[in-house]
Amino acid sequence: MLIWWRGKFRRADEISLDFSLFEKSLQGAVYETLRTYSRAPFAAYKHYTRLKRSADFFNLPLSLSFDEFTKVLKAGADEFKQEVRIKVYLFPDSGEVLFVFSPLNIPDLETGVEVKISNVRRIPDLSTPPALKITGRTDIVLARREIVDCYDVILLGLNGQVCEGSFSNVFLVKEGKLITPSLDSGILDGITRENVIKLAKSLEIPVEERVVWVWELFEADEMFLTHTSAGVVPVRRLNEHSFFEEEPGPVTATLMENFEPFVLNLEENWVGI
């Protein structure tokens, strides 16, 4: 693990926070999670824009320009000989930024994962906007405590609509059509989600962004999740419902196969890198 704090790269045991900063961080720190592809920071500008958007909810200053942000990302990633996961935290009041770099170790997910429907409902948009990425969101914290013997849990909205996983976006396939909850369902505008939608359209796979009801998941032909670290993650089982035993369905498999080449060649993912 490598940490960037107050202009320097440091080891974890070299970091100390004064108590007032620690206390404020307990109120919630704005954050983003990035990764590298071919050891280059993926979608840095989009992540920076989202970080600033979250900061704006609190009228927080962001102490780094985009150029400074990318310099830290690239310098930190260069210290590793493999792909890297990067967590970026923006502390309340001060606007100071902390980067945490760690090796990206993704297990083999091609055989699919099991997910479950969470008992926790998504906080309504008027209470906490889904576009706000902040540590300590109570719905996410409580939902993640339910992740036992499964990969992720799916949060529903107050009306029973499908929202998202505790760290992922949700997709289903029905009769060859790709369907995903629309942004007004109460979800984060995931960057990997956006790339998968663009990939599907480039492959002439029909895409629907709309309100999705929980029963539709159980009637789907295929289901998968998307998130920064792993890209496209096929769902083998939802609660007691099985989607496949050996291999993901054809649409999921096609998107998995084409995802990395697509994101590597989409120029908007590499602005400033």
From Swiss-Prot:
Any one GO biological process: isoleucine biosynthetic process
Keywords: Amino-acid biosynthesis, Aminotransferase, Branched-chain amino acid biosynthesis, Pyridoxal phosphate, Transferase
UniProt EC number: 2.6.1.42
Membrane-crossing residue ranges in chain numbering: none
Reaction(s) the record says it catalyses: L-leucine + 2-oxoglutarate = 4-methyl-2-oxopentanoate + L-glutamate; L-isoleucine + 2-oxoglutarate = (S)-3-methyl-2-oxopentanoate + L-glutamate; L-valine + 2-oxoglutarate = 3-methyl-2-oxobutanoate + L-glutamate
4Fe-4S found in the keyword field: no
Family: Belongs to the class-IV pyridoxal-phosphate-dependent aminotransferase family.
Class of this enzyme: transferase
Reported function: Acts on leucine, isoleucine and valine.
PANTHER family: AMINO-ACID AMINOTRANSFERASE (PTHR42743), BRANCHED-CHAIN-AMINO-ACID AMINOTRANSFERASE-RELATED (PTHR42743:SF4)
CDD domains per the UniProt record, alphabetical: PLPDE_IV
Protein name: Probable branched-chain-amino-acid aminotransferase
Signal sequence residues: none
Pathway the protein takes part in: Amino-acid biosynthesis; L-isoleucine biosynthesis; L-isoleucine from 2-oxobutanoate: step 4/4; Amino-acid biosynthesis; L-leucine biosynthesis; L-leucine from 3-methyl-2-oxobutanoate: step 4/4; Amino-acid biosynthesis; L-valine biosynthesis; L-valine from pyruvate: step 4/4
GO MF term set: L-isoleucine-2-oxoglutarate transaminase activity; L-leucine-2-oxoglutarate transaminase activity; L-valine-2-oxoglutarate transaminase activity
Pfam families: Aminotran_4
Modified residues (N6-(pyridoxal phosphate)lysine): 133
Gene: ilvE
Cofactor requirements of the protein: pyridoxal 5'-phosphate
InterPro entries with a match to the protein in the record: Aminotrans_IV, Aminotrans_IV_CS, Aminotransferase-like, BCAT-like_C, BCAT-like_N, Class-IV_PLP-Dep_Aminotrnsfr
